[in-house]
Amino acid sequence: MGKYGDKKVVDLSEWGRPLARVITRFLKDKPVSVIQVTNFHLLLSLYSAWLIYEGNTVLACFLLIVKGVIDAVDGELARTRERPSHVGRYWDTVVDTISLIAVMCAFGSLYDWGIAFTFGMIFAILFQYSLFNHYSILMRALGSGDATSRIDERVRPVAHPWEKQRNVNILHFIYLCFFNWQDRIISALSGKGSKSLVFELTVSSTLGFGMQSLLIFGLALTQSLEYLPHLVLGVNMFLMVSVLLRSRL
């Protein structure tokens, strides 16, 4: 069964999922944990940020595409081994945010954005990711019944038998402190959505890292990365507003 069960939806951020599944099949019986995979794409992101800081943007942006594929492997590996993990999904959120901050700060340094503008870019992207995540969670619940991720994370989850409750509690607390506000704002802005959620998921999926990494790589190849703010604050914000408006019609 796919990520969204039997629902026929177009998730543009999932273009790398077939490759992620190939890697997952290779790792399934190897002594590699899901957390180790997550930590690897964190290191890859930090290395990409350093390359951007050094001005090697094409290689850096290509590695961000690779990072996006590896980012899909940890979830696929957990599903293949039938070991969903609260620790894993919370840690994945923390890692993605650290990666985003590092990469955007590197771009900010390279293009002299200034501190305020750089953090404005970071917050804009966080909200765009949160919108996509919001509809991805709803569609997974609607299509496959997957309830591992939740729209409202305020209730502390009970650890699975293969993970420690103490670790779940710590990462759940971190999530509530640093990330829950994004979910609550997006939930407040979003309406009930269309019956099938196809429009909302498809359009918001362009805001996911998988699709955004391709667009950013395209900007790097054409030496047009100075237009990155136009993508994030212009095109992406227009798509975000379109989804929010559609969800209320």
Located regions from the model:
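Membrane-embedded alpha-helical segments that form the functional core of polytopic membrane enzymes
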Residues: 34-87, 103-104, 120-123
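Hydrophobic core segments of alpha-helical transmembrane domains in multi-pass membrane proteins
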Residues: 60-67, 116-125, 229-239
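Structural signal for membrane-spanning alpha-helices in multi-pass inner-membrane proteins
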Residues: 45-53, 103-107, 133, 220, ...
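Membrane-spanning helices that line or support transport/gating and their immediate boundary helices
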Residues: 22, 26, 72, 76, ...
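Transmembrane helix interruption/hinge and helix-loop junction motifs
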Residues: 52-59, 109-116, 221-229
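Select subsegments of transmembrane alpha-helices in polytopic membrane proteins
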Residues: 34-39, 91-96, 201-210
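Alpha-helical transmembrane segments
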Residues: 108-138
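C-terminal membrane-associated helical module and adjoining short loops/tails
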Residues: 1-18, 138-249
